[in-house]
Amino acid sequence: MELTKKEISALQETAKQYMEFASLPIQKEKIKLWKALNRSKMERPMVVIDQIPWNEMNNEHELDLFVENPVFRRVELNLKKEIYKYKHYPVDMVLDPFIRIPKAISNTGYGMKVEEETLYASGNVSSHVFKNQLATIEDAKKIKDMVITHDELETDRRFETASEIFKGIAPVMMEGNMFHLGVWDHLSQFM
C-alpha cells in the first residue's frame, strides 16, 4: 500500500515535533543518569511511567492517526505516544534522536485463535467471555511453538521508504519486534 502525500506530510510533521523534544539537551543528561543507574552508580532514583491506558488518553485528539498503511500507522502511533508522554509526564524518559521503523517480522502465535463473545462494549471499555478450548489434557496438544520469520526484502523496502520520508528530519533505525511472552495472558483467552 502506497502512502499518500497527505500521509507522508502527517508523518513528517509528527517526526519534526518528536525530534524537537528528542534534540533537547536534557536528553543527554537523562541518558547519563540512566547509564549511572545501570552501572550500579545511581545518582538518584529514576522514574518511568509505564502501563498507560491509551484508550483513555486521546481526549484532546493528540493521538489521532492519519496514516492508513499498517506499518507506517504503527510508526505514527509510536511517535505520537512518545510525544504525548513527553508533553504530559516526561519524568526520566529519554527520546532517542532517530525514528524507529519495525522490521518485517512475523509470528505464528500459539497455533490457536481466540474465540470470544463481547458481552458489553461502551466507548473504549468492553467485557468478553472466552470459549474454553483447553478443557482437557488432550486439548493442550493444540498449543504449538511459535515460529518467528523475518522478510529481509520487505525490511529493506521499509527502510528505503522511511529514509525517503524522514530525509532531512531524522535518521531512521530499523528495530526488531518485541513479542509478548506472558504465556498466561494468552492462555487465559483460550480457557
Predicted regions and their residues:
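Catalytic cores of TIM-barrel enzymes
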Residues: 1-191
